[in-house]
Amino acid sequence: EAVEAMFDKQLGIFEGGVNQYIEIEAPVEGATYATGADWARDVDWTIIVTLRTDVFPYRVVAFLRTGRRPWPFMIKNFDDQVDRYGGTSCHDATGLGTVIDDYIKSDAEGVVMTGRDRDSLFTDYILAIEKGEIEAPFITFMEGEHKYATVDDLYGSGHAPDSIVAGAMAYRASKQSGVRVW
């Protein structure tokens, strides 16, 4: 029920297709934002999510699903989105993410998702969704990943869905201070 409440069709309906950049709201002067990314190239998807954080509930204002492209292109997508909205940012620095960390131009926090850090990343994000603290337009790809994720995907041996990782990274970034500078 919380996932269904999070995705509001009145905010827009989008597929979330490959390389479909979705901008629900352009940057607003004085607003605050947080961006998160999950990296993938060959098998899964690189997802970049930006939250507007000076409103309640926080609102997904930009979404990109990409992949099967060279790393420099996807890193540039992330840097461009962070540059456009400003604010704080986090990305998955697990595995190849540590290499990517060396190429990101923005001041993003690289988060290694292991052990207690991984658990708290997902727990905090899930609690925010359950408390109605995050809303998003109905993005079919993102909604499906959120709706069908299992406990094993997040806390066990399964694979955490890409849009959940990106959303959790954006939510984590929202807990850091950051005001857009014009």
Predicted regions and their residues:
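Proline-centered turn/helix-capping motifs that create local helix->coil transitions or kinks
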Residues: 2-3, 45, 133-138
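Acidic active-site catalytic centers that drive phospho-/nucleotidyl reactions
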Residues: 38, 92, 162-165
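Mg2+-dependent endonuclease catalytic cores in nucleic-acid-processing enzymes, primarily RNase H-like
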Residues: 52-153
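Well-ordered alpha-helical segments embedded in enzymatic catalytic cores
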Residues: 47, 73-77, 165
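ATPase catalytic-site recognition across NTP-hydrolyzing enzymes
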Residues: 1-37
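Catalytic-loop motifs flanking and including active-site residues across diverse enzymes
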Residues: 44, 97, 121, 162-166
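Gly/Thr-rich phosphate-binding beta-strand-loop-beta motif of the actin/hexokinase/Hsp70
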Residues: 27-53
